[in-house]
Amino acid sequence: MPNILSLTCICFNSVLCPTSFFFAKLPEAYAIFNPIVDVMPVIPVLFFLLAFVWQAAVSFR
């Protein structure tokens, strides 16, 4: 039970203070991957749009 409570507190803390989540920096060893990490959240949206393009290609069967 304490694990669930602590997890809930962590989730609420992330919701209340999202700026620390969005503006977190990678460690210096991984700084070269910053451009890739910036684009990664957009990838699921591209798959969502691809589904519409695919359905349009097959005439929404």
Curated annotation (Swiss-Prot):
Membrane-spanning parts: 32-52
Keywords: Chloroplast, Membrane, Photosynthesis, Photosystem II, Plastid, Reaction center, Thylakoid, Transmembrane, Transmembrane helix
Domain of life: Eukaryota
Keyword Magnesium carried by entry: no
Presence of keyword 4Fe-4S: no
Compartments in which it is found: Plastid, Chloroplast thylakoid membrane
Membrane topology: Single-pass membrane protein
Any one GO BP annotation for this protein: photosynthesis
GO annotation, cellular component aspect: chloroplast thylakoid membrane; photosystem II reaction center
Propeptide: 1-24
Record family assignment: Belongs to the PsbK family.
Function of the molecule: One of the components of the core complex of photosystem II (PSII). PSII is a light-driven water:plastoquinone oxidoreductase that uses light energy to abstract electrons from H(2)O, generating O(2) and a proton gradient subsequently used for ATP formation. It consists of a core antenna complex that captures photons, and an electron transfer chain that converts photonic excitation into a charge separation.
Self-association state and partner proteins as the record states: PSII is composed of 1 copy each of membrane proteins PsbA, PsbB, PsbC, PsbD, PsbE, PsbF, PsbH, PsbI, PsbJ, PsbK, PsbL, PsbM, PsbT, PsbX, PsbY, PsbZ, Psb30/Ycf12, at least 3 peripheral proteins of the oxygen-evolving complex and a large number of cofactors. It forms dimeric complexes.
Protein name (record): Photosystem II reaction center protein K
Native source species: Sorghum bicolor
